[in-house]
Swiss-Prot record:
Keywords: ATP synthesis, Hydrogen ion transport, Ion transport, Transport. The keyword Ion transport applies. This is V-type ATP synthase beta chain. It comes from the Bacteria. It comes from Streptococcus pyogenes serotype M28 (strain MGAS6180).
Amino acid sequence: MSVLKEYRTVSEVVGPLMIVDQVAGVHYNELVDITLHNGERRKGQVLEVQGDKAMVQLFEGSTGINLAKTKVRFTGHPLELAVSEDMVGRIFDGMGHPIDGGPELIPEKYLDIDGQAINPVARDYPDEFIQTGISAIDHLNTLVRGQKLPVFSGSGLPHNELAAQIARQATVLNSDDNFAVVFAAMGITFEEAEFFMNDLRETGAIDRSVLFINLANDPAIERIATPRIALTTAEYLAYEKGMHVLVIMTDMTNYCEALREVSAARREVPGRRGYPGYLYTNLSTLYERAGRLIGKKGSVTQIPILTMPEDDITHPIPDLTGYITEGQIILSQELYKNGFRPPINVLPSLSRLKDKGSGEGKTRQDHAATMNQLFAAYAQGKQAKELAVVLGESALSETDKLYVAFTNRFEEEYINQGLYTNRSIEESLDLGWELLSILPRTELKRIKDDMLDRYLPKADTTMTKVFVAND
């Protein structure tokens, strides 16, 4: 059996890859133990087997490997993660080793980090609301349990701060079920890692979180394994411990860059912009691990965060992510420059399952109606502001000026809630009604009269300030 054999037939090392000759009985995805000439031990994984040659990806890098003196042993099983409920509240490196100074975990079991394929028939439909405390998400782009809703960011935007805000504020309403956050950070700097660890510790959110950190100077292969390790942890907590788990993965762009690096080392034919042709398939093996299962109490919800290179939403990473996931939250450079935090651009953002997680019994009966009216009013106000820039304020009607006033207050009060303000869904809904009261009742055509009678506050026209676009 290959598990009993030790090979000294390493013929080539290229970047993070190693070629072992004269192998027998070796299988794809098999875990590999590597012993260097100085006794140092490293781990690897079989990427490909052709005849009697095996290509092994190295998790700890290839520095210091002596071809003639390196010993290789194939273990006969895939890379597995030791899991335990005691992982909650702990901090790990990208390979699942504790780095917080705490005790070693006593594993309850070992799980393959690639998980198991979920039969579509076994999936339950996501329809339960998750409150993030952020109005632009909870009210306008509702997140539900089992959904995968990515955040599309740009260079220099505060996506790390947004990720930390969601991690500490997210909660399940009207439920006694346990809620946990699994946070996977890939390719981040030491300063960013310190920010995440300190923020979760200082706010107490670490007590319900599991944090995996892969630094920018860690091997690219480890970066590929980190999200799989995080998702394996989430599936264990969800399906075996009955917890509702929110998985936040940042930055998926760094993950895809690692895929491209390994693909280039394998001399594969590149696809769009040099990324491997199987990028879509590879991303789907991560994103499709979100969901709910019939007969299982827990759920896995995903918020992958990625930075769009050159703010290009047609770039392969956001483009392919959008095909797999159920919407997107888009951050805006313009809103960020104007000082709005978080700078969520609500008009191009979308949650395809928002209708399933809102309404009476989940949030409130006026949720959908106010959401649609806010979208319509904000879009019309943006159009009025653009018209004022071209033709001047005098070209605006009185109604247009009210839409401009609404748009400015919407951005300043609703979107610009701050990175440390936790709003309940009721507070977001009430604020939405307050802003809609700026407009004449006749303009609120997407809300039924009985709902207007119940929720719409009387507008104080003496206090309404009209801001023009070029103020």
